[in-house]
């Protein structure tokens, strides 16, 4: 618990120093603040202040939007540094999120841990050819974007990984999975 609190304090201090948006929000925090003392934020406010909440001051909403106009950029690094993802917008307010290499590595590790939490699942995966198929919405979303990123980084995995668009008719998804 102490380590988690220390890391949270470091993260909040970093955000406060490097993001004008969070710097303003965190300015009045007491010295001995707890997680519940942090002001809440929402997607609408974050997108309205996009250029102010990012901690990398070189990234702008205009540059991100320009990058996202080309669907060939799905799974590519913007400026050689960031994968760009969006939330689905199911609430009517999609949020654009940037992942650096560290964030992507942590996300990938957590995905593997969740997928193969049981030893028998990992054993079956190894025995049956080490192939994975995922069904995500196609676009700049975390699921499909991260699969495309992995395939760009490791093209030799092309026959081992597949992403199917969730909006594809079910019969077509089943056919593709059976062929895979």
Show the residue positions of the predicted features.
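Nucleotide 5′-phosphate-binding alpha/beta core
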Residues: 1-86, 93-131, 138
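Conserved adenylate-forming
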Residues: 10, 17, 137-180
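Glycine-centered flexibility sites
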Residues: 89-92, 143
């Amino acid at each position: 618990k102490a380590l988690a609190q220390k890391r949270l304090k470091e993260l909040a201090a970093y955000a406060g120093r490097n993001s004008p948006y969070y710097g303003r929000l965190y300015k009045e925090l007491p010295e001995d603040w707890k997680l519940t003392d942090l002001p809440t934020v929402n997607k609408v406010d974050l997108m309205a202040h996009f250029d102010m909440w990012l901690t990398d001051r070189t990234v702008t909403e205009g540059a991100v939007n320009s990058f996202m106009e080309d669907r060939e950029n799905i799974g590519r690094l913007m400026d050689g540094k960031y994968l760009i993802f969006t939330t689905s917008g199911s609430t009517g307010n999609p949020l654009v999120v940037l992942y650096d290499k560290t964030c992507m590595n942590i996300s990938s590790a957590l995905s593997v841990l969740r997928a193969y939490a049981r030893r028998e699942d990992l054993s079956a995966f190894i025995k049956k050819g080490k192939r994975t198929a995922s069904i995500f919405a196609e676009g700049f979303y975390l699921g499909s974007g991260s699969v495309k990123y992995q395939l760009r980084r490791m093209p030799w995995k092309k026959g081992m990984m597949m992403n199917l668009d969730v909006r594809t008719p079910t019969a077509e998804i089943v056919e593709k999975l059976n062929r895979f």
